[in-house]
Curated annotation (Swiss-Prot):
This is Tropinone reductase homolog. Pfam families: adh_short_C2. It comes from the Eukaryota. Keywords: NADP, Oxidoreductase. Belongs to the short-chain dehydrogenases/reductases (SDR) family. GO terms for molecular function: oxidoreductase activity. Substrate binds at residue 154. The active site is at 167 (proton acceptor). InterPro entries: NAD(P)-bd_dom_sf (IPR036291), Sc_DH/Rdtase_CS (IPR020904), SDR_fam (IPR002347), TR (IPR045000). Gene3D superfamilies: NAD(P)-binding Rossmann-like Domain. SUPFAM superfamilies: NAD(P)-binding Rossmann-fold domains. Its EC number is 1.1.1.-. NADP(+) binds at residues 21-45.
Length: 268
């Protein structure tokens, strides 16, 4: 099953021979991204804060014939990010084709209830870590001669959503960095894009729906999207993978919403 190609074996639709780093790759959208990239032939390096999650996923991928490896890493830690990139450098001989900044977190609160610690956690994980990983990965991406960065942003970085002011700010910052790096690093043959999902059926959403009040809020938000349903992780990972394929070679600096039409709905 590993190494799928479409388009009659056209190399524009293959990631065979390419290397990728996906942060937070053992759950939800990150897990789907690792599988999709590996299925198109990429050799993937990923990380997780949980050794148990990592071991379980690596075994599943091994059984599927995917080339996936990686360590435990908390990307909010500067020293752990540096160690991660040293491992990537060693594993991929100093070259990296794909960087997926997927790891992220949120704390839902009213704006007046956020603390300095909340701010540090959300911005540190969602923005600082992603930005710094781009800096650390730049020499490897440039050395590959054909590289792509994709940020996992959010519809919350495009329009206002409840209880998410700091999270939205972190994703809005990601969206602007996407545009800035796309322009600054084009000369190095590095493309930079972002995907901006809305509500996706992940373990986090499933857990939240176990609380009646949260389930009601989530269902209300889902109902505002024209497609009237939550998305699936595979519906995000497919776009992420497309943006990394050679066939997307003229696409850079874009923030693409994967939201069932939520951000463009004028009939709310």
């Amino acid at each position: 099953m590993a190494g799928r190609e479409i388009g009659g074996g056209d190399r524009r639709w293959s990631l065979r021979g390419m290397t990728a780093l996906v942060t937070g790759g053992t759950r939800g959208i990150g897990y789907a991204i690792v599988e999709e990239l590996a299925n198109f032939g990429a050799e993937v390096y990923t990380c997780s804060r949980s050794q148990n999650d990592l071991d379980e996923c690596l075994e599943k991928w091994r059984r599927k014939g995917f080339k996936v490896s990686g360590p435990v890493c908390d990307v909010s830690s500067i020293s752990q990010r540096q160690t991660l990139m040293e491992s990537v450098t060693s594993s991929f001989n100093g070259k990296l084709n794909i960087l997926i900044n997927n790891a992220g977190t949120t704390i839902p609160k009213e704006a007046t209830n956020f603390t300095a610690e909340d701010y540090s956690i959300i911005m540190g994980t969602n923005f600082e870590a992603s930005y710094n990983l781009c800096q650390l990965a730049h020499p490897l991406l440039k050395a590959s001669g054909n590289a792509s960065i994709v940020f996992n942003s959010s519809a919350a970085g495009v329009i206002a959503v409840p209880l998410s002011s700091i999270y939205a700010a972190s994703k809005g910052a990601i969206n602007q960095v996407t545009k800035s790096l796309a322009c600054e690093w084009a000369k190095d043959s590095i493309r930079v894009n972002a995907v901006a999902p809305w509500i996706i059926n992940t373990p986090i959403i499933e857990a939240a729906c176990q609380v009646p009040s949260q389930k009601k809020n989530i269902e209300s938000l889902i109902g505002r999207a024209p497609m009237k349903r939550a998305g699936e992780p595979s519906e995000v990972s497919s776009l992420v993978t497309y943006l990394c394929l050679p066939t997307a070679s003229y696409i850079t600096g874009q923030i693409i919403c994967v939201d069932g039409g939520y951000t463009v709905n004028g009939f709310i």
